[in-house]
A protein has these predicted regions:
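Short amphipathic beta-strand/extended segments with alternating polar/hydrophobic composition
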Residues: 56-59, 185-192
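Carbohydrate-binding/catalytic loop surfaces
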Residues: 196
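Active-site-adjacent scaffolding segments
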Residues: 40-132
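Short acidic, gly/pro-rich beta-turn/loop elements at beta-sheet edges
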Residues: 24-26, 58, 82-84, 150, ...
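Vicinal oxygen chelate
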Residues: 1-7, 11-19, 46-47, 61-85, 91-138, 142, 163-184, ...
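Short, low-complexity, polar/charged sequence segments that are solvent-exposed and flexible
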Residues: 33-35, 56, 76-77, 93, ...
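Core segments of cupin and vicinal oxygen chelate
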Residues: 2-53, 88, 96-104, 142-186, ...
Length: 262
């Protein structure tokens, strides 16, 4: 499970680069039950709250040619050290380590297969507050064309532990990842081997996908459709996991809705 007790390599933030920030807020607000506030000193950025706790952010998409996408951030005590580890492991630095005064230190990267991710050292007011509950991040998932290579990279950078488990129906293997030295209940994501043809949502490039917890996957999926998004897969039940739907927002950013099995 994802918690707010951040340890090295655990998810601690996520944000969306959107071509139209107000339109994105108008979509995600009803779908996930979020409310939005502009933090002081920012230009066009909105913080999302779920039941009074910070659930992430939405900011302007400024990179020419880039697609709208969610970016996961993983905790690090030292963004500079992690940036060096990324380079040694074959990744690239997209955004050099920098400080956001009063909030956090961060850096953004691309792994060797092209998936984008970031790291964060939160300040006292930084990081996610809404996790594993309605409207909160409850899982992170990487679709990779070389799952073994991806795991080797992230284990080098973060020291993640991993465990393979059969996919439902015996169709392939799903790899669960957990921060270094943490028990199995601190698992925070998975890596799935896919072919290039299965990466249409991310224009053929491996990518990370956020999974948001919702009280009713079916009702949330209806809200996605009502507000101009697309339900690509589902809702469908994954035995032992919950009810899930893969969706895209009106700008094409993909995400997953899940009502966990209790």
């Amino acid at each position: 499970m994802i918690t707010t007790d951040f340890v090295p390599g655990s998810p601690c933030w996520l944000d969306l680069g959107a071509p139209d920030v107000p339109a994105a807020a108008a979509f995600y607000g009803p779908v996930l039950g979020w409310e939005f506030t502009p933090p002081p000193g920012t230009d066009g950025f909105l913080l999302a709250d779920a039941a009074g706790r910070t659930a992430g952010g939405i900011g302007p998409l400024t990179e020419r040619g880039a697609r709208s996408a969610w970016m996961p951030y993983f905790f690090t005590p030292d963004v500079h050290e992690t940036a060096a580890s990324v380079l040694r492991a074959g990744g690239t630095v997209r955004v050099e380590p920098r400080d956001v005064p009063g909030w956090a230190s961060l850096a953004q990267f691309t792994d060797p297969q092209g998936a984008r991710f970031a790291v964060l050292t939160p300040g006292p007011a930084g990081g996610l507050g809404a996790v594993d509950g309605p409207g909160g991040l409850c899982w992170t998932e990487l679709y990779a064309t070389d799952a073994a290579g991806a795991l080797a990279f992230y284990e080098t950078v973060f020291g993640w532990q991993h465990e393979d488990t059969p996919m439902p129906g015996g169709d392939g293997t799903y790899t669960i990842v957990t921060p270094a030295g943490q028990p199995a209940e601190r698992m925070h994501g998975g890596v799935l081997q896919v072919g290039p043809a299965e990466l249409t949502l991310s224009r053929g490039t491996p990518s990370w996908h956020p999974v948001f917890a919702v009280p009713s996957c079916d009702e949330a999926a209806d809200r996605v459709r009502d507000r101009g998004g697309i339900v690509v897969i589902g809702p469908e039940t994954a035995p032992g996991i919950g009810r899930m739907a893969v969706c895209t927002d009106p700008s094409g950013a993909d995400f997953v809705l899940m009502t966990p099995e209790r």
